[in-house]
Amino acid sequence: MILNCNPFSGLFLSMYLVTVLGNLLIILAVSSNSHLHNLMYFFLSNLSFVDICFISTTIPKMLVNIHSQTKDISYIECLSQVYFLTTFGGMDNFLLTLMACDRYVAICHPLNYTVIMNLQLCALLILMFWLIMFCVSLIHVLLMNELNFSRGTEIPHFFCELAQVLKVANSDTHINNVFMYVVTSLLGLIPMTGILMSYSQIASSLLKMSSSVSKYKAFSTCGSHLCVVSLFYGSATIVYFCSSVLHSTHKKMIASLMYTVISPMLNPFIYSLRNKDVKGALGKLFIRVASCPLWSKDFRPKFILKPERQSL
């Protein structure tokens, strides 16, 4: 792997910590506030969990390599990165689609919302998506395991991205490439089409609304989601469908960095800055932590110096 970025080790560590802390705060805020126990925030907390796992697949290994000043990654570690990146990337994709469908039903069919979007159905869908991605990732890894690689092969990337790994294989990768593009098309284009259709219906419904308050609330919620969708799908499309246009290795790495690191890091800020409910829940969470008895004076450690007994 290409790792000549020692000056940026602190930057990547900071980005990783900000991502984990930000998404963890979203999960804690949603779980600790009963007012946020609805489907929209259920999806958001799931997305935060997936984003933590997504960035944890690549950055820790990269930081270890930078610290040890090596570029090595074992074959098993590379297969593991391919497996988990495919799984968590696919789950990001599915969750963004479900969130778009949730907004579509809430805005366009509010009277039937509780019937169409119920917690049991959505939890079952998420579980089904996890199983689908586990199977797809396993097939990718099994097909990749049949390929031959030379010892000391350099992957022109900062992690084992499937498309880049296939390019350095010494055996025929036709089946791998066909499966990769078919799966990427089905699991990428179909959800993207669903998101576009949902927002086209949402836009037409918003134009018919007379209440400016309702419009603002819908725009703020949908605007945050659209920012995340644009960032994730835009960078992923460049990597998987426009790789022939990006002849520079560094441009491909920057595009990959956008959806594997930047997008998970920005998601908590995008969803919280324009959302009064999330900001309120975070404020209550901070107040609860600050007023915890653990930090009060009575719970500070005390040491009592006892006089030693003098022997007669």
Curated annotation (Swiss-Prot):
Matches recorded under Pfam families: 7tm_1
Membrane topology of the entry: Multi-pass membrane protein
Any one GO BP annotation for this protein: signal transduction
Transmembrane segments annotated in the record for this chain: 7-30, 39-60, 82-101, 121-139, 178-200, 218-241, 254-273
Bridged cysteine pairs (disulfide): 78-160
Tissues where the protein occurs: Epithelium of the tongue; including the taste buds.
Top-rank lineage group of the source organism: Eukaryota
Entry-listed glycosylation sites: 148
Extracellular membrane side: 1-6, 61-81, 140-177, 242-253
UniProt keywords, alphabetically: Cell membrane, Disulfide bond, G-protein coupled receptor, Glycoprotein, Membrane, Olfaction, Receptor, Sensory transduction, Transducer, Transmembrane, Transmembrane helix
Any one GO CC term of the record: plasma membrane
Recorded GO MF terms: G protein-coupled receptor activity; olfactory receptor activity
Xref: CDD domains: 7tmA_OR7-like
Ranges of the Cytoplasmic topological domain: 31-38, 102-120, 201-217, 274-312
Subcellular location, record wording: Cell membrane
Family from the record: Belongs to the G-protein coupled receptor 1 family.
Function recorded in the entry: Possible olfactory or taste receptor.
Listed name of the protein: Olfactory receptor 867
Organism this protein belongs to: Rattus norvegicus (Rat)
Lineage: Eukaryota, Metazoa, Chordata, Craniata, Vertebrata
Gene: Olr867
